[in-house]
Regions:
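Juxtamembrane helix-entry segments on the extracytoplasmic side of multipass membrane proteins
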Residues: 9-14, 44-47, 77-83, 156-177, ...
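Transmembrane alpha-helices of multi-pass small-molecule transport proteins
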Residues: 39-92, 122-126, 146, 177-181, ...
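Hydrophobic/aromatic residues within transmembrane alpha-helices
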Residues: 34, 51, 103, 129-132, ...
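Hydrophobic/small/kink-forming positions within alpha-helical transmembrane segments
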Residues: 25, 29, 57, 89-94, ...
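Specific transmembrane alpha-helical segments of multi-pass solute transporters/efflux pumps
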Residues: 68-112, 153, 234-252
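Hydrophobic transmembrane alpha-helices of multi-pass small-molecule transport proteins
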Residues: 63, 125-126, 136-156, 209, ...
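Glycine-/small-residue-enriched transmembrane alpha-helix faces in small-molecule transporters
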Residues: 1-50, 160-187, 230-231, 311-312
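Helix-helix packing/entry segments at the starts of transmembrane helices
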Residues: 19, 54, 93, 97, ...
Length: 312
């Protein structure tokens, strides 16, 4: 049995995608705890970007060390891949988080969550343009509508406003970067080691964020043990989740994997409630989970039907 056979299994892929979104969901409360522990104010953009940069840079180094140990040699990025992987790190890590951290200061958390969720829908709708095997179907469109309804349900109907337009535009730019990152990642993963791809894109993206954070005057107290432990966990989350996610994108249609991202705000809400004492026992949470689950099922249902007929 080949090592990648389990990654090609649709049931494993669904379980792994849910696991990734669960890990990313833990980032919500841990980032809040990290800001509190390091005493990072809402207006301290430089330190926030530095915090993110160190998180992703450390994650990239973790993945690189794992790669070297597993291959029993130092991994070196081929010259012909340097610009491509740098573009992935710039898009999926650096620009996405810069737009997010700047934009969130000019809009509401509700708008941020709703607009960010559009990354999954943009990927589903655009994937057929870049990948012939990733067809747009009625079920996928229905799945997107159900998923978006679920995001609306958990966040309420605050709506967009001219007062938050600047922030909303920046968050949408972040969303485009996230969707673009998924497309680029899938294209680059073909014929390449997804672990190597993840390691270098996180290192490039994290390093750029770190430099920008320092230039903007960001500072962190590295003697703060609790803060560093939180930062370490966030790095582990990024290292594990991005590595698995990139591998899944290599072997499965982008639309069928990225739709699982809609679970991130659900896990984030539940875990924030458990860890930070926020109220999670709301009807909206249950309705949102049901709608998003139905949306994910709708997007993936064709694949399962084909598996039963032995065609996939």
């Amino acid at each position: 049995m080949k090592n990648n056979s389990i990654l090609k299994n649709s049931v494993f892929a669904c379980a792994a995608a849910v696991f990734c979104t669960l890990l990313w969901g833990t980032a919500f409360p841990f980032i809040k705890l990290g800001y509190s522990t390091f005493e990072i104010s809402d207006s301290d953009l430089g330190t926030k970007i530095l915090f993110a940069g160190i998180r992703f840079l450390t994650a990239g180094i973790m993945v690189y060390i794992f790669l070297c140990i597993s291959q029993k040699r130092f991994a070196v990025l081929h010259k012909s891949d340097f610009a491509k992987v740098f573009a992935l790190g710039l898009t999926q890590t650096s620009l996405q988080y810069i737009f997010t951290y700047v934009g969130i200061g000019f809009t509401s958390g509700t708008n941020t969550s709703i607009i960010t969720s559009c990354a999954s829908f943009i990927t589903v709708l655009c994937a057929p343009i870049f990948f012939k095997s990733d067809r747009l179907t009625v079920l996928k469109i229905v799945g997107c509508l159900l998923g978006f309804s679920g995001v609306i349900a958990i966040n309420g109907f605050g709506g967009l406003s001219i007062d938050t337009l600047f922030g909303d535009v920046l968050i949408f730019m972040s969303t485009l970067c996230a969707a673009g990152g998924n497309i680029i990642s899938k294209k680059l993963a073909k014929g390449r080691n997804p672990v190597e791809l993840t390691a270098f894109q996180l290192i490039f993206g994290g390093l750029l964020l770190t430099v920008i954070g320092v230039i903007l005057g960001g500072k962190l107290d590295f003697g703060n043990i609790n803060g560093m432990l939180i930062l370490l966990w966030l790095s582990v989350v990024s290292a594990v989740a991005f590595t698995i996610w990139t591998a899944l994108l290599k072997y499965h249609p982008a639309s069928k994997i990225t739709i699982f991202n809609l679970l991130v705000p659900i896990f984030g809400t539940v875990l924030s409630g458990l860890m930070l004492g926020e109220n999670i026992f709301r009807l909206e949470t249950l309705i949102s989970l049901i709608l998003i689950s139905l949306g994910i099922a709708a997007v993936n249902i064709n694949k399962k039907a084909k598996n039963k007929n032995g065609k996939a």
